[in-house]
Structure formats: C-alpha cells, structure tokens
Amino acid sequence: MADKKRYEELINILDQYSYDYYVIDNPTVEDAEYDQKMQELLKIEEAHPEWVTPESPSKRVGGEVLEGFKKVAHDTPMLSLANAFNQEDLADFDRRIRDKVGDDIAYMCELKIDGLAVSLQYENGKYKQGATRGDGTIGEDITANLRTIRSIPMKLQKDYSIEVRGEAFMPKRSFQKLNEIREEEGQMLFANPRNAAAGSLRQLDTKIAASRNLDIFLYAVADFGEMGVETHSAGLDMLETLGLKVNKERRLCNSLEEVYAYIEEWTEKRAGLAYDIDGIVLKLNNLEQQRQMGNTVKSPRWSIAYKFPAEEVPTKLLDIELNVGRTGVITPTAVLEPVRVAGTTVSRASLHNEDLITEKDIRIGDTVLIKKAGDIIPEVIKSITEKRSGSEEPFHMPKNCPACDSELVRLEEEVALRCINPKCPAQIKEGLIHFVSRNAMNIDGLGEKVIIQLFSQHLIKDVADLFFLSKEKLLELERMGEKSVTNLLASIQASKQNSLEKLLFGLGIRHVGAKAAKSLAIHFDTMDNLKVADKETLTSINDIGEKMADSIVTYFANEEVHDLLEELKRAGVNMTYTGPKLEDMSEEELVFTGKTVVLTGKLEKLTRNDAKALIESLGGNVSGSVSKKTDVVVAGSDAGSKLAKAEELAIPIWSEEDLIEYLPDEGGLNE
C-alpha cells in the first residue's frame, strides 16, 4: 500500500525530470523511466484522490473541460512596446535615454518571441493563476491550459509570491506536426505558430491544449525591484535559479554598436531557431534608470522592440478585383498566385487605390513583390519590370460601379473613387454586415454568410428587416437548424436593448466611428434629439469636427433615413443612451475628450488629415506645437524636436499604431 511520503517523493522526482528536459534541455532519464514513475503516481492518485494537489505532474496532461474564460485584472499593467524599424529609430531611443539618465547605461537585448504574452502568478512558490495579456489591464484566466505547458514549474525553488511575465509559443516542429494531423483529418490548417499557440491556450478542453506541446520563455517580473535585484539582467538570472525557463540567447550590450551587432547576428540566424522570432527587444538594464524613464500611456520609455524588416516575396499578379465598401469606396485588390509570406499563405493583397497602381505601373500578369505591412496586412510593393514578357496588361479603373453600374465619382480631397448610389447592393450588403458586427449591434449568429443568404434571397433589404425575420424563413436557410435559429432570434431580440451608441455606430454614418458614436449618444441622449441637431450644435462637441458634423446633418436630412428609423422604432429597437453619463466615465473611456494632441514625424499608414480627423472624432483638439498644456503626442518616424520636447516634459507619447486602434471598422476616415 502506497504511503503519502512516497507520493510526495514521486512529485519531486517527476518535477525534476520535467525541469531537466523542458527547461534546461538536459534530460537525465529515458522516457520509459519517466513513464513508469508517472504511472505509479497516477495509481496512487486513483487510490487517494484526497492527496491530489493542483501542483501534481498529473495535471499537465489535461482532462478538465472549462465552461469559459473569466476576466482577470493584472495588478501591474502588461504594457505593449514601442517599435523601432531601423538604426535611426534605435539611435533616437538611445538619445532619449541618455538625455534623461546620462551616459552610464547598458541594454539587455533579448529575442522577441512570436507568441502570446501571458502572466503567471505564484503564491508562496506555488503556481496559482495564469492569464493572457488582454488589453494590458484585463486579461483572460487560462490557468488550466498554461498548467499543461511542461516548462512552467508548478513550484518554484523558493517560496516567492510573484507575478512573472513571458511569451507562450508553439515550436516549429510542434506546429508542423499539428498541421499534418489537421490536414489528415480534413480540418482547417493554422496559418502560423502564433495563431496555433493562441488557439491552443483558448481551448475549453485542456486535453487539447496539453496535446499541442506548447513552450514558454519568461522575461520579466511585474516588479523586479521586489526581488532585491538592481538590474534586469540580474532579475533574469534569478528567474533561472527559481526554476523558470529564460531564453539563453540574451546579451548585455554596453553600446549601440553592440546592439546593432546582436541584431545583425540574429537577423541571419533566426531561420535556424526552433521557434519563431519577429524582432529584438532592448531594455535599459538598470532598474533605477527604468524608474526614472517611466512609462507612456501604452508602453515603457525604457524599452523598445526592434522589428525585423518585412519579408519581401515575388509572385504573379493574376488579376485585379474591385471591392465596394459599405461607404461606396472602390478598392482594388490584387489576386495573386499563392505564396508564403511571414508564416502565412497569401493569395490576395491590397492595392489601395488607382493612383498607387498608376504611380507604380502595376500591370496584370506582372511578377510583383509583396510584403506584410507591420507583418499583418499583405500589400504589393512594386512590379519587377525586368521580368515582363510583353503580355502584361495595364489596369484602368472602370467608370461605373462593378456592383450596380452607377457612375463612379471622386469627391473633393479624396484619392479613392466612390459609388454614391444609396441603393447599391454591395454597399447595402456590407452595411448589413457592419450593423451586426461586435462593435455595433453585436448580433451573434448573423455572420457574413448568413447575411449574404438573407440578402440574396430578398429576405432583408435594410437593417430594419433583420428585426422582422421569422423562424420559418430562417429555417429555410442553409445550415440553419432549430437550435441555431432559436439562438439567433434570441440574439436579435437582445440587441434591441443596446444603448444608443451601438445603434449609431451600426448605422454606418460616414466618418462616425465607435468613439464618436458614444460621444454623440452621451451628449444628445436620444435619437430624436440627435437627428434635429444642426452643424453649430454638433461642432460645439469636442469630439465632432466640421467634416463629421456635415456628414451627420446630411445623413439625417435623408427621408429614407427617417423611414428606416421609424421601422426600427416599430421593431422595438432602443433609441436612448443607457450607459454611464459623461461625469461618471473614466478617462480611458473618453480617450482624447478635452485633451490637446500634437502630431509629429512621418506617419506610414494615415495621412496627416486622417490622423487629425481621427483625433477630433475621439474628442481631442490638434495643436501644432508642444507645450506644458499638451496632453498627448502622437509620434511617427523621423520625429524631431517636438518629440524631444515631449520627452523632456514627460508628456505621454503614442505611436501611430496606438492611434490606428481607434479607427472605424473600415479602416479609413475619408470613406
């Protein structure tokens, strides 16, 4: 008969075996011996379930089925990092550091793992909770799934109570095996290891998470200072002594030249790693100097992520298709011979507008170079003209809409061509898809395919029709069974109670994003008040600029809009603001309301006018100079004296990417 002492001994032995194998990559026993001891442990646990603790090695194989993922607050925010794309960006970062703390500095350089940022909490040395980064303040509880990662110790070598940050990832070999299995089973393949890791950690069945063979590198403690160390490098060393897995390829650099050499080395060697990396992270090593530098709204001033240059890959441009957005903008899209770029297969890419196609002389049949902007959005960089055979065809934008044949127009100060026919079926369809989306009316079960079916079968012609759908009609649709239809109708019914801002955003009024919709709802309280507001009243609201005000007035002057609103009222859709009033709202919810914002440097994705309009739509006032009254500086590349002054005055600095997070769904302000 087993005794508890033997049980505890087995736990310690198996923990040590796991540490040797998964953390320090130095296995000390054969698999057969590990399996024999694990079986012995499992038999004891079967006989004595009262002895089993959450730290038992048996918990790593999964088996628990979760109901969902609850939200958890991070005691210390998990900030994102500002990006650097070249040596000039790094030199600017270094200058800001030296201006603030002097020249006696060193940088800890670490590989930027391409995975999922997570937080691990240990209480008295025992693993207590694991969470995703989420929005940096609130994440999701994935404790059970993280427990299945063998390189995460359930007990530390010392009884510390700490919160550790790291990057969970799927090794390349595990990713390849997983996709091979999925292909054999006829399942959709994962695009890249990052997506596979994220999907694995959000499995409700922990056995599935356990089968995915994830790994982790830990790179920080929420507050290293609590551990009695003075430098980041010493903190990483201490994490290793606690039994945590820290990446060995880190290097302490005493100059920018050493940083550049480290980057160059890993730019060349990255392909040979067992896992994906997408850059190098620099951290000011001295913790006191880190505290002196402080943080911006989104990121620490003492750290930066150098992003590897986007991979550029040649492929064939087979065709150029035209897409009609919900506001009528005609967007050309490149149809490509499928090719792998930055870990995913790309068969379509953005061409932005006609002017860009003409300027770059891109022709159908060309061999073109493509890359992923920010490693996310595929785009065509240029044609490789020396590979032309003479059969390539220049592209010309049509004069009429590809969806409704109406004449296309180019509005003043706009680059894009636009269809202005309010009856255009493509615009109506895209508008319906937008209306039911998460940030708008959030109607579960009404995905794009269902909307297309409903529209093509003439069951809906506008958003009001959604609220008059019958069970009988829905059951006639493909892949819509009794349960799906019941759930969908319940979701439609629930959406009627949404607060006014959700409806306003869903209506797709030109230039009105989610944040502006909320400000309008708060200010006017009811749809009836808003629809009679004049331009002067609208522009008196901090969030609303002249262009947006004109758009709102024009929208509500349309008799068809009045008819639509009456139909929505008849359906029982709420048209009153039911959320917290302005005085009760947090600063985070208000974003830029009442704040002065300065733009500086070169923006890569937004025009200066777009950025200004977006800031105004979020309630901010754009100023041309930095002063003590400035609340936020949005800095692009090549930012000069304004950025330096903002740093000197300790003004929060946003990147262009931070600002883009608040774009309306269609991604543009001139649409």
Curated annotation (Swiss-Prot):
InterPro entries: BRCT_dom (IPR001357), BRCT_dom_sf (IPR036420), DisA/LigA_HHH (IPR041663), DNA_ligase (IPR001679), DNA_ligase_CS (IPR033136), DNAligase_adenylation (IPR013839), DNAligase_N (IPR013840), Hlx-hairpin-Hlx_DNA-bd_motif (IPR003583). It is an enzyme of class 6 (ligase). The lineage of its organism: Bacteria, Bacillati, Bacillota, Bacilli, Bacillales. Belongs to the NAD-dependent DNA ligase family. LigA subfamily. NAD(+) binds at residues 31-35, 80-81, 110, 133, 167, 283, 307. Zn(2+) binds at residues 401, 404, 419, 424. GO terms for molecular function: DNA binding; DNA ligase (NAD+) activity; metal ion binding. Residues 587-671 form the BRCT domain. It holds the Pfam family DNA_ligase_OB. GO terms for cellular component: cytosol. It comes from the Bacteria. Its EC number is 6.5.1.2. Its cofactor is Mg(2+); Mn(2+). This is DNA ligase. It catalyses: NAD(+) + (deoxyribonucleotide)n-3'-hydroxyl + 5'-phospho-(deoxyribonucleotide)m = (deoxyribonucleotide)n+m + AMP + beta-nicotinamide D-nucleotide. GO terms for biological process: DNA repair; DNA replication. It comes from Listeria monocytogenes serotype 4b (strain F2365). Keywords: DNA damage, DNA repair, DNA replication, Ligase, Magnesium, Manganese, Metal-binding, NAD, Zinc. DNA ligase that catalyzes the formation of phosphodiester linkages between 5'-phosphoryl and 3'-hydroxyl groups in double-stranded DNA using NAD as a coenzyme and as the energy source for the reaction. It is essential for DNA replication and repair of damaged DNA. CDD domains: BRCT_DNA_ligase_like, LIGANc. The active site is at residue 112.
